[in-house]
Regions:
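C-terminal or late-domain output modules
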Residues: 147-186
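Active-site nucleophilic cysteine motif
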Residues: 7-10, 128-163
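Non-catalytic ligand/cofactor/substrate-binding and regulatory segments of enzyme domains
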Residues: 1-133, 170-186
């Protein structure tokens, strides 16, 4: 995400070795300082994604493992298939953009596509068609998927920040017999 609000964090899902992410990854559609734009969904290789994040933005990544029952796993797979039906493939531009330090570089979406074996999609319908940092954001998509496993924690107002989601996962990890079974820092 290129918005000023990406500083508050970001939530991705990893399922079967593929990272699943949602955000405003098309700079040509950004408005309101990156707060609004086309909703882009992508799937990419987990290990290559971790390497890209560490190299590009020196991010600290927190990974949580969730133990899914066969029923939960089936529900997650159904939700992923349902979401994918609401999209069309999207190829990010190969044009370089000016970075904060004045240099030219490929967009984040282009790097995801070409450096992490990424598949990118734009939503053509549903609430995810337009990304909005305060409501239709990365946490909403993650919770739409992971909520199928019984972790539906969105606030009644419909907004939850990435840090709140992380705090929930930390609390669950500390509980005995929780479905959150592991935590890793990358």
């Amino acid at each position: 995400e290129t918005s000023l609000f990406s500083a508050i964090g970001h939530v991705d899902i990893c399922y079967q070795g593929r990272v699943i992410s949602y955000g405003n990854y098309d700079p040509s559609s950004e408005t309101l300082f990156g707060m609004v734009g086309d909703g882009v969904l992508y799937f990419c290789d987990r290990d290559k994604y971790i390497d890209l994040c560490k190299r590009e933005s020196q991010k600290t990544l927190f990974g949580y493992g969730i133990d899914l029952t066969p029923e939960m796993e089936e529900a997650v797979q159904e939700k992923l298939a349902e979401l994918k039906q609401l999209t069309i493939p999207w190829e990010p531009s190969a044009d370089k953009i000016k970075t904060e330090d004045g240099k030219e570089d490929y967009t984040y979406a282009y790097k995801i596509r070409h450096e992490t074996d990424g598949e990118l999609y734009k939503f053509i319908k549903s609430k995810f068609k337009s990304y909005f940092v305060l409501s239709t954001n990365c946490v909403l998509l993650a919770d739409t998927i992971v909520g199928q496993a019984g972790t539906d924690i969105l606030s009644p107002k419909g907004f939850i920040a990435p840090g709140t989601y992380q705090a929930y996962l930390d609390r669950e990890f500390e509980k005995p017999n929780s479905i959150v079974v592991s935590k890793h820092v990358y």
